[in-house]
Amino acid sequence: MTEAKSYKDTVNLPQTKFDMRANAVKREPELQKFWAENQIYETLSENNPGDIFILHDGPPYANGSLHMGHALNKTLKDIINKYKLQRGYKARYVPGWDCHGLPIELKVLQSMKQKEREDLTPLKLRHKARDFALSTQKEQSESFQRFGVWGDWEHPYLTLTPDYEAAQIGVFGQMALKGYIYRGLKPVHWSPSSQTALAEAELEYPEGHTSRSVYAVFPITKASDTAKKVLTPYLKDLGVAIWTTTPWTLPGNLAVALNPDLTYAVVESGKPVCKHQYFIVAADLVDKLSATFETPLTVKATLKGEDLEHTTYRHPLFDRESEILIGGDYVTTESGTGLVHTAPGHGQEDYIVGQRYGLPVLSPVDEKGNFTSEAGQFAGLNVLKDANEAIIKELEEKGALLKEEPYQHKYPYDWRTKKPTIFRATEQWFASVEGFRDTALEAIKNVTWIPPQGENRITPMVADRSDWCISRQRSWGVPIPVFYDEETNEPLLNEETINHVQAIFAEKGSDAWWELSVEELLPQPYRNNGRKYRKGMDTMDVWFDSGSSWAAVAKQRPELSYPVDIYLEGSDQHRGWFQSSLLTSVATNGIAPYKMVLTHGFVLDEQGRKMSKSIGNIVDPNMIINGGKDQKKEPAYGADVLRLWVSSVDYSSDVPIGQNILKQLVDVRNKIRNTARFLLGNLHDFDPEKDTVAYEDLPELDRYMLHRITEVFTEVTEAFETFQFFRFFQVVQNFCVVDLSNFYLDIAKDRLYISDPNNLRRRSCQTVLKVALENLAKSIAPVLCHLAEDIWQFLPYKTPYKSVFEAGWVELESEWKRPELTPKWSKFRQIRDEVNKVMELARKDKMIGSSLDAKVLLYVSDKELREHLDSFNPSDSLSNNRVDELRYLFLASQVDLVDSPKTIGKANYKSESETLGVAIVKADGEKCDRCWNYSTHVGEFVDDPTLCERCNAALKGEF
């Protein structure tokens, strides 16, 4: 008996050194090194043929490790930049850092011993703060680069460099010369814990703040002429009732504001609730207040709000009289009494009313939040600690307290110290938004906002905002370049002085303000003009720092342009950087600094909760990349998985992340990787120059596949063009699994492995594989940049491009688009799904092992479909084009089209409906040793008795 021949070496199995595993911790840094050594980003951003494209970086704060918000933000930016580079744009990205401000100052102070703090001069503090900011910036920069983010990392912008600070002084100077900068005593958000003014963007409003609210009565002393008639009968024992959630502001009370259009009532209380028998409240609130005070209030008289104007009352705690005045539309009947206690030194609306009536700005509180001597008996008490208690007690003793109750509401806290803030009037520098508000609102309309509701967020913020307080009482920042006349305290701020300081900062940096004398900082004409000056010690709000970046970076660097194409940050920046940049740019140039603004949400855990140390649900981006201490619990996934997560979520709202989500993403990455590996392995002997099959010679299956490739990558392109990266994620994942792995590649194995290497049947398939592989690599490159490059480096044939990024974007030929093929092939694929289901039943019962053990019986009622199927079912496996056949489509050895559904009914394994019947029976003939198909021709060939007719022909180079 002769030994059976082995045909193992005659089969064309895949060959590639492309690793099945990503091994990201080792491989990603190698690929990043390859990009750096070959200067891929630099070359493309410099030499691409298209327009310059600028996504301007909103600077992260240089004061700690990166969190998931940073990862989301920087990766989104990088996806856009890489896509634009692939599309031929000169995408130039300069990463930036916000380096000044209180948070860094606090970090430095916290790291020092008490003794060190006592010896601290502003200059020493600034040097320590600079060192801290620079070391943090370096760490963050390395992390961002490990994410795979491209940019000009050698020349980032830092808000602490001399060129930046000088440009910022330039913006300030232009605004000052246009009359938009002024000094005023105004109430501002003041943080006693930081001892400085704060901007709106530096506040947060935590849940669950409870204030001690009080209803109090101020005795009326004189009725206005228009109210005399109504009030006179009650004047002897009449008060005006107010409500406040900040009793500590009562020493600053200089008026009571009302709404002129409301009706007010003089009420009498059923039982005594204060020393007055009668008091005035809004008529609409009588019933509500009766319940609050737990006594019936009887209406004795009513009058219009406007008639009460100029009625006077006495302050219950101080020896002074004030008037009832007309307030704004903030005086409502939603809460309180319909009459608002007004302290112009402690509130924005109060201040505006006070200005209208010429009231002084009284703010008897110092920078630590303690009452000054102006608060009389309350001097020395802290307004956030013991002042409320003392004031409420005093109101009670004077018979002026109606009721005290806890009130839960949103209250502003210092975003860094996490402690409550107050409104306090101080001498500050302001940017007058009023001067250019309309231009700013017009500019907003000319910007594209993605998502569109961004416009609806920023518009009311700009429309309703007060003037911008830009001064801070801290050392670590850019100084406001103002001098004061020692004698008159008049500020000196003009073109000459500003330009002189700007030139000094450009050369020496803003430390010069502390290092140089007043004489050196002043231009020549002011040095000996008979006046003595001192320099101001306020620094600028850090939002003015970052808000000047368009001027310091985009406008100043020759390789960039202004206005820039895109700003992209979190949705909280409508009140922050988007707005400060808009205001400075509009004030100086009349235009927005950006053409488009994209916003993303916040990162939450898998349960949709905010990340916090106390819950212990913080996900660290570096941990995702490099893994944790326990690699079983926290494996190292690499940067691509992090980037894939960014593309998988709808970033326009808040987005979740956690271990379960990451595991799913690893699966998706691996599926894409394995698909690419199969494609690479089966192209090992393909030379595109000589082996490519012309389109007109391709089997219909291949032409259908090229049509699907066109559909898929057109949709991917549209996803990137519209910044809907989650669509890219869904489409590519679906393409790899449904179109390639489960369909085309499944069918292709027979052609690729069994046919003669040079046969058209095989080369036509490889022609499609090459198109699929290259377009897959290019399309994932903006997101899975490391995987895409890894694939490209293992291409088995010559390519003129050393990097996938040099190869540009996906390439699709117009002739590949054949929508007319879709209906027929969709039907074929549906039938295939049905066949697979029945195969599975037969396999489960062990009637068949592989699908090649089966013959498929098929009944269709539709005449046209029957004809299509007939044309795909030749009687002879060596005729036709040997590709467009049902047996290959179904991965079966034979297919019979039957004329009657009864034939299907007789089989054990079947699926029947009115229009389609599928049955699985044993295949005819013997199993071929080489291709494992069953054939009635096995045994016919003397030299190869165990082979079928296809393999016999293949070995002769004919199949």
Curated annotation (Swiss-Prot):
Catalytic activity, reaction form: tRNA(Ile) + L-isoleucine + ATP = L-isoleucyl-tRNA(Ile) + AMP + diphosphate
GO BP, sorted A to Z: isoleucyl-tRNA aminoacylation
Binding-site list for ATP: 613
Gene3D superfamilies cross-referenced by the UniProt entry: 1.10.730.20, HUPs (3.40.50.620), Ile-tRNA synthetase CP2 domain-like (1.10.10.830)
Cofactor section: Zn(2+)
EC top class, as a word: ligase
Cofactor binding annotation: Binds 1 zinc ion per subunit.
Binding site for Zn(2+): 928, 931, 948, 951
One term under GO cellular component: cytoplasm
Signal peptide: none
Primary location: cytoplasm
EC number: 6.1.1.5
Motif residue range(s): 'KMSKS' region: 610-614
Pfam families referenced in this protein's UniProt entry, alphabetically: Anticodon_1, tRNA-synt_1, zf-FPG_IleRS
Record motif 'HIGH' region, residues: 60-70
CDD domains: Anticodon_Ia_Ile_BEm, IleRS_core
PANTHER family in alphabetical order: ISOLEUCINE--TRNA LIGASE, MITOCHONDRIAL, SOLEUCYL-TRNA SYNTHETASE
Known partners and oligomeric status: Monomer.
Function in brief: Catalyzes the attachment of isoleucine to tRNA(Ile). As IleRS can inadvertently accommodate and process structurally similar amino acids such as valine, to avoid such errors it has two additional distinct tRNA(Ile)-dependent editing activities. One activity is designated as 'pretransfer' editing and involves the hydrolysis of activated Val-AMP. The other activity is designated 'posttransfer' editing and involves deacylation of mischarged Val-tRNA(Ile).
Entry domain remark: IleRS has two distinct active sites: one for aminoacylation and one for editing. The misactivated valine is translocated from the active site to the editing site, which sterically excludes the correctly activated isoleucine. The single editing site contains two valyl binding pockets, one specific for each substrate (Val-AMP or Val-tRNA(Ile)).
UniProt family annotation: Belongs to the class-I aminoacyl-tRNA synthetase family. IleS type 1 subfamily.
HAMAP family: Ile_tRNA_synth_type1
The protein, known as: Isoleucine--tRNA ligase
Lineage: Bacteria, Bacillati, Cyanobacteriota, Cyanophyceae, Oscillatoriophycideae
Gene transcribed to yield this protein: ileS
